[in-house]
């Protein structure tokens, strides 16, 4: 009878040597490790791309949030905070007296006073007031103003549209400057029962001297002092004495 | 610190002004309008009367014209619009022409 060999369809692991089995196991392990490494790489790269996108989006998002809420001390520039309907005066019997006071730090050689003692306003009515600052020293100085409002409960209704606070203001030596404040009392003030007995609001500004690490907040004046006519004449006379006229001796020799 | 209210924590979080700080008028370009406004306030015992508000409007217009303030509509500043016949002149100019 013909003895035909049966074809090998099954993988007979028993016929492999120990070394061959070890190689197969390592091959499988390497393939699995490669797959895991690629998966981890994809995850990390996608996270990196996500955070890069967040970083780019953070700047406009932060600006939008600050414009809406004033977070971080950035002035609120979103128009929705002071819409036009908030700037319509409320028709009430009594007006609110806004008093203006001021104070200067002792180390700041400025004079800083309000130009008017008070103003009587209606809620929702915009008003303009002026302070005046004068630098008495012989140096250019940078000052910065902060404000406080009394009583404190009314501070939430005091809305400043534009003023001179929270930014550095540089006054040259001897300079005098008018500083306006443009503000209004929120119309909700009239309907708040807690504000019923408040007839006076005090706006108090304090000017401090700015301080830089390198001392550049105070600088020497760039303006030269102006001399009057007598001083000029004396100066010219001194110049004439100190600089005698040069005589050309060659003329005398030729004569 | 005198004048600082200590009774409320909300006062310790001051809100910045809506449009930041006015630029300083170093050259005194709008001093004339300010003096007229302050004189008007004295006449009405510091009540925020309409004629004084019109002078305040002249002052703010001067600041806008001299790049000391951003241009804006008067309704956004709570002030009345210009009268149609004035052609942008100030109230004082309109009064002088009459």
Swiss-Prot record, chain B:
Protein name in UniProt: Cytochrome c oxidase assembly protein COX19
Record-annotated CHCH domain positions: 27-70
Cell compartment(s), UniProt: Cytoplasm; Mitochondrion intermembrane space
GO terms, molecular function: copper ion binding
Function in brief: Required for the assembly of mitochondrial cytochrome c oxidase.
Lineage: Eukaryota, Fungi, Dikarya, Ascomycota, Saccharomycotina
BP GO annotations: metal ion transport; mitochondrial cytochrome c oxidase assembly
Organism, as annotated: Saccharomyces cerevisiae (strain ATCC 204508 / S288c)
Gene Ontology annotations for the cellular component aspect, listed alphabetically: cytosol; mitochondrial intermembrane space
């Amino acid at each position: 009878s013909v003895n035909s060999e049966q074809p090998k369809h099954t993988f007979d692991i028993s016929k492999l040597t120990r070394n061959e089995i070890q190689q197969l196991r390592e091959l499988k392990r390497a393939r699995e490790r490669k797959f895991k490494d690629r998966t981890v790489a994809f995850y990390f790269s996608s996270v990196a791309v996500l955070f890069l996108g967040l970083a780019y989006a953070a700047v406009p998002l932060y600006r939008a949030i600050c414009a809406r809420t004033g977070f971080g001390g950035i002035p609120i520039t979103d128009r929705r905070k002071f819409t036009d309907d908030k700037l319509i005066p409320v028709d009430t019997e009594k007006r609110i007296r806004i008093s203006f006071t001021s104070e200067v730090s002792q180390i700041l050689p400025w004079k800083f006073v309000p130009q008017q003692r008070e103003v009587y306003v209606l809620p929702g009515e915009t008003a303009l007031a002026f302070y005046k600052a004068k630098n008495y020293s012989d140096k250019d100085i940078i000052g910065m103003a902060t404000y406080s409002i009394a009583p404190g409960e009314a501070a939430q209704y005091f809305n400043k549209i534009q003023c001179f606070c929270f930014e550095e203001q540089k006054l040259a030596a001897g300079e005098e400057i008018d500083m306006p404040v443009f503000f209004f009392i929120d119309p909700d003030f009239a309907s708040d029962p807690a504000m019923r007995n408040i007839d006076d609001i005090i706006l108090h500004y304090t000017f401090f001297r700015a301080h830089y690490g390198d001392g550049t907040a105070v600088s020497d004046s760039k303006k030269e002092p102006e001399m009057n006519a007598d001083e000029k004449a004396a100066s010219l006379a001194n110049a004439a004495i100190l600089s005698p006229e040069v005589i050309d001796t060659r003329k005398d020799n030729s004569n | 610190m005198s004048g600082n209210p200590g009774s409320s924590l909300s006062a310790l979080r001051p809100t910045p002004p809506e449009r930041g700080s006015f630029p300083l008028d170093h050259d005194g370009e709008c001093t004339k309008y300010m003096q007229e406004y302050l004189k008007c306030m004295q006449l009405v015992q510091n009540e925020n009367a309409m004629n004084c508000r019109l002078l305040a409007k002249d002052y703010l217009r001067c600041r806008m014209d001299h790049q000391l303030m951003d241009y804006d509509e008067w309704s956004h500043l709570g002030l009345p619009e210009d009268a149609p016949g004035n052609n942008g002149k100030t109230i004082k100019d309109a009064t002088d022409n009459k």
